[in-house]
Amino acid sequence: MAMRQTPLTCSGHTRPVVDLAFSGITPYGYFLISACKDGKPMLRQGDTGDWIGTFLGHKGAVWGATLNKDATKAATAAADFTAKVWDAVSGDELMTLAHKHIVKTVDFTQDSNYLLTGGQDKLLRIYDLNKPEAEPKEISGHTSGIKKALWCSEDKQILSADDKTVRLWDHATMTEVKSLNFNMSVSSMEYIPEGEILVITYGRSIAFHSAVSLDPIKSFEAPATINSASLHPEKEFLVAGGEDFKLYKYDYNSGEELESYKGHFGPIHCVRFSPDGELYASGSEDGTLRLWQTVVGKTYGLWKCVLPEEDSGELAKPKIGFPETTEEELEEIASENSDCIFPSAPDVKA
């Protein structure tokens, strides 16, 4: 019996959602952070989308956001020329890292001791979070603003992307190992530690490269311009979203398009699989995040599979929420929660 994809809609942001990231799996589940042009990154329970808190302090659009592995710290990159590190449990601001231009990307090392940043000033910076007064190490070499920067290979190397170039750096020597040039703008990068795979999107292309050597593995072509793509943790599927408001799901091994569907009311800017692979999240120009099931119909999070009577002739549809909660009621709850904030709302530091 056919099942219909019914996403969970996470409201609360008032401007386009431009970045999102999941934590690792913790004793309390896993968590999701979103970056938005409204300047108010939000933290949510990863498997349900339930709002937990809003980090207040930035004075401009937030372009990048990430969580460390155990979800105890968050980091954000913003148009106010700062990156900030937060206590993800209390919501308190821990430090503000001043930059000379707009900051677009942040990433923690596995031990959470260092933070990598990149932005419009074309420099990669590495901050020792145990020495907040120390000057960061700087890596130069990009010729345009940096869109994404990621630690890889157990933090021994760094991957970074500017407009049309992806570069691989050695952390110890701070030197470039290799670079890839593209004939159009790189829109996103994702690093998969298991297998050392780098996912790159540009134009309508979704390309997979070795994160160690940058050698090509395979590539797929989508029907529309793609802004972001994510590979399933078990490398069975990949999902991608872009300018046509659609999400596409592909078989990673064959490249076959398995399904495509709309849900957002604007271009999709970011998409990521959860760490357990049970769902993926998307963020859009329409100001919402949506959570989608990898396997439609499975009881998971707020999805409860409810099958109609066999003789009804209806499509089976996964019911969202607890048995007594309607989809409309969940939307109302999300709207009410959108005005809530962490009890601590730190002021921006100079």
Curated annotation (Swiss-Prot):
Gene3D superfamilies, per the entry: YVTN repeat-like/Quinoprotein amine dehydrogenase
Sorted alphabetically, the keyword list is: Cytoplasm, mRNA processing, mRNA splicing, Nucleus, Phosphoprotein, Repeat, WD repeat
| Compartment(s) of residence | Cytoplasm; Nucleus
Q: Name one Pfam family in it.
A: WD40
Q: What are the protein's GO molecular function terms? A: mRNA binding; RNA binding; signaling receptor binding; U2 snRNP binding
Check the record and name the PROSITE patterns matching this protein.
WD_REPEATS_1, WD_REPEATS_2, WD_REPEATS_REGION
Sites of Phosphoserine modification: 312, 335, 338
Q: Is Nucleus given among the entry's keywords?
A: yes
InterPro entries reported in the protein's UniProt record: G-protein_beta_WD-40_rep (IPR020472), WD40/YVTN_repeat-like_dom_sf (IPR015943), WD40_repeat_dom_sf (IPR036322), WD40_rpt (IPR001680)
According to the lineage, what is the superkingdom?
Eukaryota
Identify one Gene Ontology CC term for this UniProt entry.
Answer: SMN complex
Q: What does this protein do?
A: The SMN complex catalyzes the assembly of small nuclear ribonucleoproteins (snRNPs), the building blocks of the spliceosome, and thereby plays an important role in the splicing of cellular pre-mRNAs. Most spliceosomal snRNPs contain a common set of Sm proteins SNRPB, SNRPD1, SNRPD2, SNRPD3, SNRPE, SNRPF and SNRPG that assemble in a heptameric protein ring on the Sm site of the small nuclear RNA to form the core snRNP (Sm core).
Oligomeric state and interaction partners are given as: Part of the core SMN complex that contains SMN1, GEMIN2/SIP1, DDX20/GEMIN3, GEMIN4, GEMIN5, GEMIN6, GEMIN7, GEMIN8 and STRAP/UNRIP. Part of the SMN-Sm complex that contains SMN1, GEMIN2/SIP1, DDX20/GEMIN3, GEMIN4, GEMIN5, GEMIN6, GEMIN7, GEMIN8, STRAP/UNRIP and the Sm proteins SNRPB, SNRPD1, SNRPD2, SNRPD3, SNRPE, SNRPF and SNRPG. Associates with the SMN complex in the cytoplasm but not in the nucleus. Interacts with GEMIN6; the interaction is direct. Interacts with GEMIN7; the interaction is direct. Interacts with CSDE1/UNR and MAWBP. Interacts with PDPK1. Interacts with TRIM48.
List the protein's name. Serine-threonine kinase receptor-associated protein
The organism encoding this protein is Homo sapiens (Human)
